[in-house]
Swiss-Prot record:
It is a multi-pass membrane protein. Disruption phenotype: No change in biofilm formation, about 35% decreased adherence to human lung pneumocytes. Complete loss of host cell hemolytic activity. It is found in: Secreted; Secreted, Cell wall; Host cell membrane. The keyword Transmembrane applies. Gene3D superfamilies: 3.30.1040.20, Perfringolysin, Perfringolysin, domain 4, Thiol-activated cytolysin superfamily/Thiol-activated cytolysin, alpha-beta domain. The chain crosses the membrane at residues 158-171, 178-187, 256-265, 273-285. Keywords: Cell wall, Cytolysis, Hemolysis, Host cell membrane, Host membrane, Lipid-binding, Membrane, Secreted, Toxin, Transmembrane, Transmembrane beta strand, Virulence. The gene is ply. This is Pneumolysin. InterPro entries: Thiol_cytolys_C (IPR035390), Thiol_cytolys_C_sf (IPR038700), Thiol_cytolysin (IPR001869), Thiol_cytolysin_ab_sf (IPR036363), Thiol_cytolysin_sf (IPR036359). Has a slightly altered apparent molecular weight in a secA2 deletion mutant, but no post-translational modifications have been found.
Length: 471
């Protein structure tokens, strides 16, 4: 066994993996109230609620384009820096490691390689040599489509996005320029989507004994001086996925509750019909993307535009070629002591803002009947008090109960906060035993963009029509 002393030192460590790999983000109290704002064309209700998000993952996203610490076989210290995806690399003399790559067509003798002293440069060089051989000998007959993965979330806070996409997402988030203030005020709805296009994965053989990864020159004292202990044990990067990833920001000022469904259709490439609510939402959506990988420059690209560029962005990196090289986009780690895959548990509280808009409407009355008519129209107007509780204020049309003759027309504007709309219309028959006859009576009418109630006919045969226009 290589380096028995170091081997015994690592095997003797006793620690709680779950405790070491758990990160608790923001903690907030649920002290939020509803509020309503009457705008010129609509009544907007803003509701904020405490939400919690937890993730358990062994697949860690890479958002830095040139991180020399993240290569297969790298030894990382388990501490706060690892939880923040800004790991501390243990740089000591290393023993050889065996690597494999999962590109199709490779003969068994070509699918693995050994690196004598693993480091970022030596591993990268060896992998690049193998990739060059694959492109030359196998790439022409083996068309490699990217393995597509995606995940999405409606953005409410940076802590929420870091739990979802990785602790170092803030770097990418800054490039996306996420306007959280507009989200919290209800002015915008924003969704973040992460597309991963995996070209190939480089893995290292499982470590049989912890001491096998070190040269004999490395001592227990060397590890102790670098802070390695049961409180700060070691993991090694067991695999790295290479490819291309795209972070999309979809931003709209629409207040519709169909926004998430419209974005889902966009992501899945569903054809959206014209003259639909989804089409209106997407036409009112701005797109910003941060692209990592798939470009010989090896840098991050930021592009902006409309939704019609989303499909092009995805198709652009859909296949692995020499012109579309892969960058590290995610990695997994295993504990050096026992090869158990490291699973990170992250959680946070955040404030979800839900906005519901109620358009103003009009109630049109048209009376052309050969009789005297009376109208009784009432409704409630919704508001919220300082505790966020609903307050319903009774309202009535100022011409209720008046005798109105033909031809009478009027339009009653109704604000978006109108609830419990009731309309009763009666006509004078002239009959002693039934002086007034009800022509129309409905309660709890929904507020629509335009409702026209027309009455006509004679005293004994009154007619009525209730026509709704709500496009």
């Amino acid at each position: 066994m290589a380096n028995k002393a170091v081997n015994d030192f690592i095997l003797a460590m006793n620690y709680d993996k779950k405790k070491l790999l758990t990160h608790q983000g923001e903690s907030i109290e649920n002290r939020f109230i509803k509020e309503g704002n009457q705008l010129p064309d609509e009544f907007v209700v803003i509701e904020r609620k405490k939400r919690s998000l937890s993730t358990n993952t062994s697949d860690i996203s890479v958002t830095a384009t040139n991180d020399s610490r993240l290569y297969p076989g790298a030894l990382l210290v388990v501490d706060e820096t690892l939880l923040e995806n800004n790991p501390t690399l243990l740089a000591v003399d290393r023993a050889p490691m065996t690597y494999s790559i999962d590109l199709p067509g490779l003969a068994s003798s070509d699918s693995f390689l050994q690196v004598e002293d693993p480091s970022n440069s030596s591993v990268r060089g060896a992998v690049n040599d193998l990739l060059a051989k694959w492109h030359q000998d196998y790439g022409q007959v083996n068309n490699v489509p990217a393995r597509m993965q995606y995940e999405k979330i409606t953005a409410h806070s940076m802590e929420q996005l870091k739990v979802k996409f990785g602790s170092d997402f803030e770097k990418t988030g800054n490039s996306l320029d996420i306007d959280f203030n507009s989200v919290h005020s209800g002015e915008k709805q924003i969704q973040i989507v992460n597309f991963k296009q995996i070209y190939y994965t480089v893995s290292v053989d499982a470590v049989k004994n912890p001491g096998d990864v070190f040269q004999d020159t490395v001592t227990v004292e060397d590890l102790k001086q670098r802070g390695i202990s049961a409180e700060r044990p070691l993991v090694y990067i067991s695999s790295v996925a290479y490819g291309r990833q795209v972070y999309l920001k979809l931003e709209t000022t629409s207040k519709s509750d169909e926004v998430e469904a419209a974005f889902e259709a966009l992501i899945k490439g569903v054809k959206v019909a014209p003259q639909t609510e989804w089409k209106q939402i997407l036409d009112n959506t701005e797109v910003k993307a941060v692209i990592l990988g798939g470009d010989p420059s090896s840098g991050a690209r930021v592009v902006t535009g409309k939704v019609d560029m989303v499909e092009d962005l995805i198709q652009e990196g859909s296949r692995f070629t020499a012109d579309h090289p892969g960058l590290p986009i995610s990695y997994t780690t295993s504990f050096l002591r026992d090869n158990v895959v490291a699973t990170f548990q992250n959680s946070t509280d955040y404030v979800e803002t839900k906005v519901t808009a109620y358009r103003n409407g009009d109630l049109l009355l048209d009376h052309s009947g050969a009789y005297v008519a009376q109208y009784y129209i009432t409704w409630n107007e919704l508001s919220y008090d300082h505790q966020g509780k609903e307050v319903l204020t009774p309202k009535a049309w100022d011409r209720n109960g008046q005798d109105l003759t033909a031809h009478f027309t009027t339009s009653i504007p109704l604000k978006g906060n109108v609830r419990n709309l009731s309309v009763k219309i009666r006509e004078c028959t002239g009959l002693a035993w039934e002086w007034w006859r009800t022509v129309y009576e409905k309660t709890d009418l929904p507020l629509v963009r335009k409702r026209t109630i027309s009455i006509w006919g004679t005293t004994l045969y009154p007619q009525v029509e209730d026509k709704v226009e709500n496009d």
